[in-house]
């Protein structure tokens, strides 16, 4: 079978926020084709791979991606045409070398990732394998706990509600992914009713979660617990809670500005707040509890809570092996958030996950707030056996598509599928 790359074509499409992004088609000599589209974040880490934007204010307020598209259709195509799509690492490393920068700013992380993912899809198609099996082999059968972001704050809610960006539920007590998805959907709808009864807006944010104008951050947890119970489930043993404060968004001059509560706190005071919540509520995961460059604060956080809950670094690590290695060496967390577009290739994404595993850390795959209907992260999650992922609320087509892909994968695996459940998290 001829799995050499014959053609690559990129185009500018829209993401779930109506902003331009890159979509790439890769066609092989055997006729197999792979298509991938690239997401975009709102609360981006300062150390992420660069998303190349045109900055032409006459188009899409400067957010066009025609330069990235052109880079795929010219320079990248010319370099990888004729290469074997099965040689994923070789192709990815060639694109990294071709770009020549540490942050993929010349060709664009969005251009490179689009090609990287489309190549993998084309190769899987040529071999007549589902993507998760192509990437993970026969042993890939661990279904993840879905982390449903059902209540939004921070930048995702235009700073109209809680300071903390995401309040999630994790149905660890379910027996399968299919059951976990049902539990999550039921709690989501109960939360809508709870909010409506309390006189709050039930409009949804970028990731499908509700974005009520709450007075206190803890109100979000109280409302979610009420919704879990009203749906007929037990907080803790059946459904746990995860929080992503996205603390870099309210960190300034060494202090954390809790706008909704009208106070500024230092790292230790914020850690004390988290500790009191872990004592009081069934919290299993805390992501980006402190700012991306507050390394000394993270050490204190890990010392306080690292043996009780999973502490995930997102902006702290940006899926970058150099930053993850520093985190392991300095003992600042116990898990890594994995976003392929933070680093820019499938090969580097897998390396980040493997580095986390090597340190007995957790790895949680994630979507971005500006998404597409590309479901590659679902296949990647099962392929790498990460056991948990977050991809928004069970609402909005671009979020639900990932969850539906997991249903297909679980069905495809049949009796071989097993649900990560309570073992999903490091604790």
Swiss-Prot record:
Residues annotated to bind Mg(2+): 244, 287, 314
UniProt cofactor(s): Mg(2+)
Domain of life: Bacteria
Source organism of this protein record: Pseudomonas syringae pv. tomato (strain ATCC BAA-871 / DC3000)
EC number: 4.2.1.11
Protein name per UniProt: Enolase 2
Cofactor: how bound: Binds a second Mg(2+) ion via substrate during catalysis.
Sorted UniProt keywords: Cytoplasm, Glycolysis, Lyase, Magnesium, Metal-binding, Secreted
Complex and partners: Component of the RNA degradosome, a multiprotein complex involved in RNA processing and mRNA degradation.
Gene expressing this chain: eno2
């Amino acid at each position: 079978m001829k799995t050499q790359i014959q053609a690559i074509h990129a185009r500018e499409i829209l993401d779930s926020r109506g902003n331009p992004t890159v979509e790439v088609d890769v066609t092989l000599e055997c006729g197999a084709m792979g298509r991938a589209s690239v997401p975009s974040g709102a609360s981006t880490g300062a150390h992420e791979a660069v998303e190349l934007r045109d900055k032409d204010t006459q188009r899409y307020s400067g957010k066009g991606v025609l330069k990235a598209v052109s880079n795929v259709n010219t320079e990248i195509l010319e370099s990888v045409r004729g290469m074997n799509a099965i040689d994923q690492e070789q192709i990815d490393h060639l694109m990294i070398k071709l770009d020549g920068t540490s942050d993929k700013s010349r060709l664009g992380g969005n251009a490179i990732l689009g090609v990287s993912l489309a190549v993998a899809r084309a190769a899987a198609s040529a071999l007549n394998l589902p993507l998760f099996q192509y990437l993970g082999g026969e042993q890939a059968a661990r279904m993840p706990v879905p982390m449903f972001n059902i209540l939004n704050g921070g930048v995702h809610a235009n700073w109209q509600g809680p300071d903390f960006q995401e309040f999630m539920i994790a149905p660890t007590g379910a027996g399968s992914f299919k059951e976990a998805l049902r539990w999550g959907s039921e709690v989501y709808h109960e939360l809508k009713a709870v909010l409506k009864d309390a006189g709050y807006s039930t409009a949804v944010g970028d990731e499908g979660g509700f974005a009520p104008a709450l007075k206190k951050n803890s109100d979000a947890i109280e409302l979610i617990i009420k919704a879990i119970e009203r749906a007929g489930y037990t907080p803790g043993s059946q459904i746990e809670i995860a929080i992503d404060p996205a603390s870099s968004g309210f960190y300034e001059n060494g202090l954390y500005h809790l706008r909704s509560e009208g106070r500024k706190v230092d790292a230790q005071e914020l850690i004390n707040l988290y500790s009191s919540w872990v004592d009081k509520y069934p919290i299993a995961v805390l992501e980006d509890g402190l700012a991306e460059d507050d390394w000394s604060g993270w050490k204190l956080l890990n010392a306080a809570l690292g043996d009780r809950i999973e502490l995930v670094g997102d902006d702290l690590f940006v899926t970058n092996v150099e930053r993850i290695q520093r985190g392991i060496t300095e003992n600042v967390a116990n898990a890594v958030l994995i976003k392929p577009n933070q680093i820019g290739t499938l090969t580097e994404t897998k390396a980040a996950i493997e580095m986390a595993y090597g340190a007995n850390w957790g790895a949680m795959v994630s979507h971005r707030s500006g998404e597409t209907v590309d479901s590659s992260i679902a296949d990647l999650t099962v392929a790498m056996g990460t056991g948990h992922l977050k991809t928004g609320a069970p609402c909005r087509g671009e979020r639900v598509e990932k969850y539906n892909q997991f249903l297909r994968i679980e069905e495809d695996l049949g009796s071989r599928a097993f649900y990560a459940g309570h073992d999903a998290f490091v604790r």
